[in-house]
Design a protein with these regions (language model features):
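Mid-domain alpha/beta scaffold segments of enzyme catalytic cores
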Residues: 1-106, 112, 122-134, 141-149, ...
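Gly/Ser/Thr-rich loops at beta-strand to alpha-helix junctions
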Residues: 116-119
Length: 241
C-alpha cells in the first residue's frame, strides 16, 4: 500500500461521479478519505508508525481534492467500531485527533465511522473536536442511531441509518434536537450483497413515513416542509460543501 494507491482510488471515485453526472444529469458529491478499519488492519502488517504516517498522507491528499472542489467532505475517518487493544485504541484516538486538526485547519467537514456506545461515543468525539478546534457541527456521525437529541449527540451532526422503527425514534427526540441531521442507507451497491445495507428507495419511503409521523405528532404543514427541506437540501449543502 502506497500513497499512489490512494491517489488511484480517489481518482477512480471522482471519475465515477463525473460519469454519473454526464450520463444521468444529476448532482453527485464525492467524499474521500482513508477508512479507519483499513488503518487498523494494515498496522498489523506494515507497522503502526509507518502506516499511521501513510494514513495521514492519504488524509492530506483527500483534503487537496476537497480544496479543488473535486470532493466535498473528508471521510470516512474515525476509529475501529469493534474491540481492539488499549494500545491500538489510544493510537486510533490520537490519529483521529490529528485528522480533526487537519480538517479544522482546512475548514472542512469530516464524516465519522465509529463504534456505537451510545452517548459516550458522542461525548468522546465532542471532546476531540473541541481539542482540535473543529466546530462540532462539522463532525458528521455516519450510521448514527435514531436519537437525534442534542443532549445525546453533544452537538455533532448525524446521518441516521433509517432502518425499521427509526422514524418513530427520530420524531420522539426531534423536539430536543438543535443540531444538523439527515438520513442515510449506507448502500453498498455490491453485486454479491444486493440491497445491502439498505436500498436507495429506503430514503423516499422513510421520508413519507416521517411526514405522516410528524402530522400525527401535531406538526403543521409549514413546519413539516421546513424539516424536510432542511434534512434533504439545506443542511446537506451546509455540511457537504
Amino acid at each position: 500500500m502506497t500513497i499512489s494507491d490512494y491517489k488511484s482510488a480517489y481518482e477512480d471515485t471522482i471519475e465515477m461521479a463525473r460519469e454519473i453526472r454526464e450520463k444521468f444529469g444529476i448532482k453527485v458529491s464525492v467524499i474521500l478519505g482513508p477508512h479507519p478499519v483499513s488503518w487498523e488492519k494494515q498496522i498489523h502488517t506494515i507497522g503502526l508508525q509507518e502506516y499511521t504516517s501513510l494514513h495521514l498522507k492519504a488524509v492530506k491528499l483527500a483534503i487537496n481534492y476537497i480544496s479543488t472542489g473535486e470532493a466535498v467532505c473528508l471521510g470516512e475517518v474515525g476509529r475501529p467500531h469493534y474491540p481492539v487493544s488499549l494500545e491500538i485504541w489510544t493510537a486510533a484516538n490520537n490519529l483521529l485527533l490529528e485528522i480533526m486538526k487537519l480538517a479544522a485547519e482546512a475548514k472542512i467537514s469530516i464524516q465519522i465511522h465509529v463504534e456505537d456506545d451510545g452517548e459516550k461515543t458522542y461525548s468522546d468525539l465532542a471532546k476531540l473536536c473541541d481539542k482540535a478546534s473543529l466546530p462540532r457541527h462539522l463532525a458528521i456521525r455516519h450510521y448514527a442511531p435514531a436519537n437525534i437529541s442534542t443532549d445525546f449527540t453533544h452537538g455533532l451532526s448525524v446521518t441516521v441509518s433509517v432502518g425499521k422503527d427509526s422514524i418513530s425514534k427520530i420524531v420522539e427526540s426531534l423536539p430536543d434536537c438543535n443540531s444538523y441531521w439527515g438520513m442515510e442507507t449506507d448502500f453498498l451497491d455490491d453485486k454479491n450483497r444486493p440491497g445491502a445495507v439498505l436500498g436507495p428507495k429506503t430514503i423516499p419511503k422513510r421520508t413519507n413515513q416521517l411526514n405522516e409521523k410528524l402530522k400525527e405528532a401535531g406538526y403543521s404543514e409549514d413546519e413539516i416542509y421546513e424539516i424536510l427541506e432542511n434534512i434533504h437540501s439545506n443542511w446537506p449543502q451546509i455540511l457537504y460543501s
